[in-house]
Amino acid sequence: MYVFNRGDCDQTGYGIGLKNKVVVLSQNALSKEHFGQLFFCTGGNGANPNPMGRTVFLISLSDGEACRSERGEVIGTVKPELLPEEAKLQLSQIRPAGAADLHTHEPEYSGYSFLEDGRYAAGVWLGSPQEVMDYVEMQKPYQHRVLICDRDDFAVMEVLKGQVIFPTEKELEAFQKSMQEQKGGGMEMK
């Protein structure tokens, strides 16, 4: 297994934010339960730039299990082009931090992230337009293609190589503006 180091990171140090990024943990920090060094950071008071706290909350890209670690055990954020395909597939299954509980909220969208060869893992349910935007932002740097579909499986958003190709930029800006004005009230992505 490849051992990631500081040279594999695009950002290192305490001056960077870790939330919604793939981070590399020091090999010394790994427990027997988590054999890979790559984790998706969901938050914690140690995830902020120049943090006051030390705790970071993570999801393993080896097995999908949630865990916590200390900020000092994080080497940095991995360069997106170095993220292995297996880790990309695992990342595609992570819902955004703060996503609505699917036991009490009806999902409105499904998100799919594709590798360059077209492979993907099962889609993830997304409960609101804000969850869609959060999912796209967290996947965009790492995935070849991200596709968002509505409940009828019609494509409502597509991102290719980090660029939104559907809807147009103008339509997306109008949608985001209306979302800000309504703050969670009934806007439909088309």
Predicted regions and their residues:
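Mixed-charge, Lys/Arg-rich low-complexity intrinsically disordered regions
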Residues: 1-28, 98
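Basic/aromatic-rich interaction segments and small domains that mediate binding to polyanionic partners
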Residues: 25-72
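Intrinsically disordered, low-complexity, charged/polar segments
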Residues: 57-98, 168
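Residue-level signal for glycine
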Residues: 72, 118-120, 153-158, 162
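A cross-kingdom feature marking charged/low-complexity
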Residues: 159-178
